[in-house]
Regions:
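A generic structural signal for ordered alpha-helices
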Residues: 3-8, 67, 80, 145-153, ...
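Extended assembly-interface/linker segments at domain junctions
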Residues: 88-93, 97-185
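Extended aliphatic helical segments
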Residues: 17, 78, 103, 128-129, ...
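Acidic-enriched, low-complexity/disordered segments with a strong bias for Aspartate over Glutamate
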Residues: 7, 43-45, 56, 65, ...
Length: 246
């Protein structure tokens, strides 16, 4: 059998589960709306709980405080029929009530999602997603040098066994460094990397909005003003990229 990316992380066999999760489990166990049920039914080929890490299976200490509950971590592989609603699908799978590392597979391409969670202040038995981070799609048969280095960095030996919070955060930091590398050209990061990447993505979104408005605008004066605004945003973007490069 061909090894998947998760197999290549060299997680101990004691953590291996390889248990298929059925679509009906999501429909029956979570309060999904009609749209979410359609996404589960139409977009997933297979979903498998590949590895489950807890203190009984691996020498990593659980971590919990008033805001966090990292007592176990699951690695889940999702084979897709469609990638069009990926982020919505990820949101549904993240209803599973513990920290997850999701690997979406579309034939030979993969996308990784990591979504740190905190304890719901209104119901301490529940976790809510703080933010959700995705890699771009990586072609495993045609990966470039940085993609290859990133995938190697995901091997379990490259992450701290201090506790599950530090362990999970390390995976998140690797993902953020990879996303930043498309601007910096390197997997190196510093304490400002996450914030700079967030600002870059915000500016890029604003640039796309302005470009769309320019295409639709018929008034010459308004179009000129929009182009001036676009120039300022592009300058800001270049400045942020330079800062990210260190």
């Amino acid at each position: 059998m061909k090894k998947t990316l998760l197999d290549k992380l060299y997680i101990p066999n004691s953590c291996k589960v390889s248990r298929k999760l059925f679509k009906k489990q999501f429909i029956e166990n979570f309060s999904l709306n009609t749209s979410e049920k359609a996404i589960i039914s139409e977009d997933i080929d297979n979903i498998t709980l590949e590895y489950l890490l807890n203190k009984d299976k691996i020498n990593i200490t659980p971590f919990s405080d008033e805001e966090n509950d990292y007592t176990e971590i699951a690695f889940i592989r999702v084979e897709l029929l469609s990638t069009k609603r990926l982020k919505k699908l990820s949101n549904i799978i993240q209803y599973i009530p513990y920290p997850l590392i999701l690997v979406f597979a579309d034939e030979n391409k993969i996308c990784i999602n990591i979504s740190p969670k905190r304890i719901n202040k209104n119901d301490s038995s529940k976790l809510v997603v703080e933010d959700s981070y995705f890699t771009e799609w990586i072609d495993l048969d045609n990966s470039n040098q940085i993609e290859h280095e990133f995938l190697e960095s995901l091997e379990i030996k490259n992450h701290p066994f201090t506790n599950f919070f530090e362990f999970y955060s390390s995976y998140l930091n690797k993902l953020i460094a990879f996303n930043a590398s498309q601007y910096s050209g390197s997997l190196e990061q510093n304490e400002d990397t996450r914030e700079l990447l967030r600002k870059i993505q915000e500016v890029e979104s604003s640039i796309n909005d302005i470009i769309s408005k320019i295409k639709k605008e018929s008034d010459i004066r308004d179009k000129v003003n929009l182009n001036i605004e676009l120039k300022k945003l592009n300058d800001k973007l270049e400045n942020l990229k330079t800062r990210l490069q260190g």
